[in-house]
């Protein structure tokens, strides 16, 4: 039996593509464009795992498909190479993070090339290259000039073990850091912030213009968190102080029985009475040690301290106590709330805990038992009594504005983006602080501000980055003799990834970020494929920067990514014992189809789980390529199931994909190829072209492969294979298995040219209609023959054909035919005696 040798075929074609720059981006202005983008990887020391190629294979199939359909295709790859892991490695080993990063990139690139992806490597970008981050810094200076980058003393999420502050989005629900799982504490520090909040409404509205999964849009909508309501001003009794609260339910103001300020609220110290001062100070100290997520956890016990002061409820003049509690955040809304315990669960729990008044203002519910959080007509609410929710809100806002104690207000949950990091391995922020108290951006002519090479990259411990130790870089003097100090904070890893898709369009431009005409030609990105874990962070930040650049006239589109697709996760295999504990794969043996613990002999349960080093279930693509070939890996990952589903890795599935490709190879290389068309494969061939074309376009790659299998099965039943159908089939399979596609194309054409730009096959609509049908012939109710006849024969014609059949004649010889019942396109029933 013939098998193809992937170890010879695959390197041969990879070399051919590289030598001939086969995938150089097309520039023919008469052709339509297609921009296929992968989320570029962080080049870790571990290298690629089999999860990476799933998304990469999908965009590669689309790119190859679109090239064959006559598009100019931009399909680039690069490296998101700044970030904590390289710096941590450098601190642990004493090596330069730049060297470590370069080694990792070389390894990633080797692995990616071994998988046969059709990237235009002339456009490769690396976020740590000064020629690249010159433009990251340039964007920052534009943000600074527009007032969108500013410094503020803010409570940050400080991670002692990482020596840096992290963004809210990088804190996990359990209050630990996303990177490393370390404790996060709140600490006031001077930080650079980006005013993403200015763009909140546009970030929300423009989600309507993009073809993204609704789940991702919802995550962004929730993160932006638009609320429409009212600001209400409360005076503090016996003082000239007041505070403002934002509420989405101003109609419940009559039910506000206490107010709560965030422990960090500027008013707290001023209104705290002497006898409460110690308790308040102690509570503030405890709150400062908790992350925002820990403080707002709905399940946690309610804590708080009374300030000793009262506020006046503006609508009824009642005195209400003012408390501080950590579930109110200074950074959210106004940092103060009015509490309506009768109709809010958290306020109700707090009121019960501290024995505060609970007054219902909506009818329906027993507020002694629980908060009533549904809608009802208003009660105990003066001029709002008897009104429904919408009417009452409108009337209360009108009253607040007329009385000068409030106004209608729209707020957002979104906070400004904490942009600085106290680490070495990141883009230097191009700002100089002068001794006269002013700060200026580094002029464009002096960009890039290059990260200095230094051995001393440990955090300074003072809250500044290690750059504070590099004095010859740090200290500068102006022409007028004024001394200055460079900004020591660096940018977060999100900076370089917020605009990289733009640089791919014009990667070698030294004069500007990218040429306007090229940006007009290629934007927006047509398909962006990557993991759903980037729903809020990267995608929101990239959209924000894109809108700033749109306002500056740099980019021609409002949105960067027209279509987004999230591939599923490839799960590994895990094993659990009777206690539910996970067992590493090297401690498992298979016997008679079951799995057992090597040491204890206990039978284990097999189940899918995320691949992890600790479970030793990570599959390295290098091993798969060596044993089965890259084409097998590509076909298997696309055939596992729908691209957006999470599916467990299976060695059996991999073997099945390899067997299929061997069958394809044998079909084309051993079957007699003929220039004459017998017509036997007309229908299945045209069905296959139609199905694969439509399904690739819709990214339904698993069903496209299934249809290719249908064709192979049908073709194998024939003695000969029509040349046009052989070539067309090879073209259809080439995007999935490109090395095999090239090899078989040469076997059929000997053209010496790549299959990549051969026009995509078309199908004949008329051949999709079945011209023949199979009918059964029954004698005495038993099937005696099956006949293929022309479709839509009349009853008489059908009867004639059936009675002329040899098998039928043998059955009815010497018998009397009582009746013949013919049903067109289905059957002939012969009754004999």
From Swiss-Prot:
In chain numbering, motif 'KMSKS' region lies across: 610-614
Position of sequence motif 'HIGH' region: 41-52
- Keyword annotations for this protein? Aminoacyl-tRNA synthetase, ATP-binding, Cytoplasm, Ligase, Nucleotide-binding, Protein biosynthesis
Q: Which domain of life is it from?
A: Bacteria
Gene Ontology molecular-function annotations: aminoacyl-tRNA deacylase activity; ATP binding; leucine-tRNA ligase activity
Query: What's any one GO cellular component for it?
Result: cytosol
Q: Does the keyword Aminoacyl-tRNA synthetase apply?
A: yes
Q: What is its main location?
A: cytoplasm
EC code(s) of this entry: 6.1.1.4
> Single Gene Ontology BP term?
leucyl-tRNA aminoacylation
Looking up Pfam families in the UniProt record yields: Anticodon_1, tRNA-synt_1, tRNA-synt_1_2, tRNA-synt_1g
Residues that coordinate or bind ATP? 613
Give compartment(s): Cytoplasm
What is catalyzed by this enzyme?
Answer: tRNA(Leu) + L-leucine + ATP = L-leucyl-tRNA(Leu) + AMP + diphosphate
Could you tell me which Gene3D superfamilies the record lists for this protein?
HUPs, Isoleucyl-tRNA Synthetase, Domain 1, Valyl/Leucyl/Isoleucyl-tRNA synthetase, editing domain
The family annotation for this protein states: Belongs to the class-I aminoacyl-tRNA synthetase family.
HAMAP family reported for this sequence: Leu_tRNA_synth_B (MF_00049_B)
Q: What is this protein called?
A: Leucine--tRNA ligase
Q: Which gene encodes it?
A: leuS
